Curated annotation (Swiss-Prot):
It comes from Cereibacter sphaeroides (strain ATCC 17023 / DSM 158 / JCM 6121 / CCUG 31486 / LMG 2827 / NBRC 12203 / NCIMB 8253 / ATH 2.4.1.). Residues 1-28 are annotated as: Disordered. It comes from the Bacteria. One of its GO terms (cellular component) is plasma membrane. Residues 92-160 form the POTRA domain. Residues 68-308 are periplasmic. InterPro entries: Cell_div_FtsQ/DivIB_C, FtsQ, POTRA, POTRA_FtsQ_type. Its main location: membrane. This is Cell division protein FtsQ. Keywords: Cell cycle, Cell division, Cell inner membrane, Cell membrane, Membrane, Transmembrane, Transmembrane helix.
Length: 308
């Protein structure tokens, strides 16, 4: 039978505390080193550091250089001299001016308007401004300006063709087919091939006047001109003091009817002062006084007491 008594008390040996190793560094990173490593792993930070830092350095150097007014002036002078020497090279110099599509008189006006002192660098010629100055001339409808190789400044113009003469007060003005001014005319005899228009607002209805003249071609040699009446309609003035009064609407058709009537009845060869076509299909004739008396006598009407 085993004994129930406890064994004799023995002291439990104590464990000695671990010795600290001296001279060895803790491999774990410090807090700031850890944060720096995490920041460096950020792509945006790496890009900003690799690109932004050199840019900031360059800007800082440039700012230090340009901080001096003398340095700025010296660099500006050097740059200007470099640009001038480049622009004045022979291959960029314009020595000739060519004007195509213009009459000799208009060509002289274009040269005087441009007033270029050649030779001149092509960089000193404003082509847009030169074109605007040329197109400001009344006789020029359109212009093209360009620099060609060989030092040639080429100007191509489309000249306005005079289509009619506008009598304004005591002056004669040449107009093109749209009513644009071309030039002044000293004497009517200088352009006997062109018809004359007159009256208030005549210059604004040139296309219609030209259509009327085209329809009146069979009697064109007798036409002295067209007069604008009330800025609404036209009167055709013929020789022998005759006048054809046209309607406001469809004046060309009225002229065509008049030509057909004249070819059938020789109407304009008679003693007629005016033909009023303002009422469609009802032309009204105004006879000369002596012709009217002859008609009355033929009808047996006494004209002895009449002044007509």
């Amino acid at each position: 039978m085993q004994s129930l008594s406890f064994p004799p008390n023995r002291r439990t040996p104590r464990l000695a505390p671990p010795r600290r190793e001296t001279g060895r560094r803790d491999p774990a990173p410090s807090r700031w080193a850890y944060r720096a490593q995490r920041l460096w792993l950020t792509p945006m930070f790496r890009t900003a550091l690799r690109v932004g830092l050199p840019i900031v350095g360059v800007l800082l150097v440039v700012a230090l250089i340009f901080a001096s007014a003398d340095r700025r002036a010296a660099m500006a002078g050097a740059f200007t001299g470099l640009v001038d020497s480049f622009q004045q090279r022979p291959e960029f110099m314009v020595t000739l001016l060519s004007v195509d599509g213009a009459s000799p008189e208009l060509s002289d006006r274009i040269r005087a308007t441009l007033a270029l002192k050649l030779p001149l660098s092509s960089f000193d010629i404003d082509l847009t401004a030169a074109r605007a100055r040329i197109e400001s001339i009344d006789a020029v409808a359109q212009a093209e300006v360009r620099v060609r190789s060989g030092g040639l400044l080429e100007v191509r113009v489309t000249e306005r063709e005079p289509a009619i003469i506008w009598r304004r007060a005591a002056n004669l003005v040449l107009l093109d087919g749209t009513g644009r001014r071309v030039d002044d005319l000293a004497f009517r005899s200088e352009r006997g091939d062109l018809a004359v228009i007159a009256g208030e607002g005549a210059e604004r209805a040139v296309p219609e006047a030209l259509e009327i003249l085209a329809a009146a071609r069979p009697i064109l040699e007798r036409i002295r001109g067209l007069v604008r009446m009330g800025e609404r309609r036209w009167d055709i003035v013929l020789d022998r003091g005759q006048r054809i009064q046209l309607p406001v609407e469809e004046p060309v058709a009225a002229v065509e009817r008049m030509i057909a009537l004249d070819e059938a009845e020789d109407l304009l060869d008679r003693d007629v002062i005016s033909v009023d076509l303002r009422i469609k299909d009802r032309p009204v004739l105004r006879l000369a006084p002596y012709a009217l008396n002859a008609v009355r006598r033929a009808r047996g009407i006494d004209t002895s007491g009449s002044d007509l």
